[in-house]
């Protein structure tokens, strides 16, 4: 029988690998939880959200100097101030939709069947966007037009449906709006910071009374594993998509979604 410590390590790896790839970390974690037999266990559902902070801190570490430059530059540089405003504008739609409909979305859509269908549909869209002849106009994620930030934020709301992928929806939106592949991926990383920190704080507050010392130890393990894994994956991901695009990730989504549907149909 699998120990809780091993589950925490494996889920931390799944989170770290999938969080910033356009494959849906939430979808993969839900399928992994089902595979591990965690069912409706409230702690493990919260665990999947809480360990996202490890992946987020990996982005902060990797982009520390760039983010610090922007933060300091915002005092005197209007372009840096504008970027910070742009991130907040992109973050706002998710806050509004999350507060209004978050609990209904979780109740109605957090289902393995929804995850699998979303993985397949999202994979087809990602494949289409990667193949069409887009003409990038924007090559610096910190200098996108303000309306572009807003529409990327609106697209991020689609990721509240498990299996859609937060990074996938924001990357696709940025590319359709004129961003190149690298800057689209980078802005998706930057937008993840306020979005996922907000989700972490909200879920930790809701589940704080149920946490035990054993739970905190498991969360710490998942946190560290997701941090290390995300550090490795993000550096490799940027170089890969710049050279090869998103075809690999699109097909991965389609294959995982299809296998998931087959397993569900067979009652696995």
UniProtKB/Swiss-Prot annotation:
Keywords, ordered alphabetically: Antibiotic resistance, Cell inner membrane, Cell membrane, Cell shape, Cell wall biogenesis/degradation, Hydrolase, Membrane, Peptidoglycan synthesis, Transmembrane, Transmembrane helix
This protein's GO CC annotations: plasma membrane
Its EC number(s): 3.6.1.27
UniProt-recorded Gene Ontology molecular function terms: undecaprenyl-diphosphatase activity
Biological-process GO terms, alphabetical: cell wall organization; peptidoglycan biosynthetic process; regulation of cell shape; response to antibiotic
Top-level taxon in the UniProt lineage: Bacteria
Subcellular location as annotated: Cell inner membrane
Keyword presence, Iron-sulfur: no
TM region positions: 47-67, 83-103, 109-129, 144-164, 184-204, 218-238, 246-266
Main subcellular location of this protein, as a coarse class: membrane
HAMAP family hit by this protein: Undec_diphosphatase
Miscellaneous comment: Bacitracin is thought to be involved in the inhibition of peptidoglycan synthesis by sequestering undecaprenyl diphosphate, thereby reducing the pool of lipid carrier available.
Protein name, per record: Undecaprenyl-diphosphatase
Organism whose genome encodes this protein: Bradyrhizobium sp. (strain ORS 278)
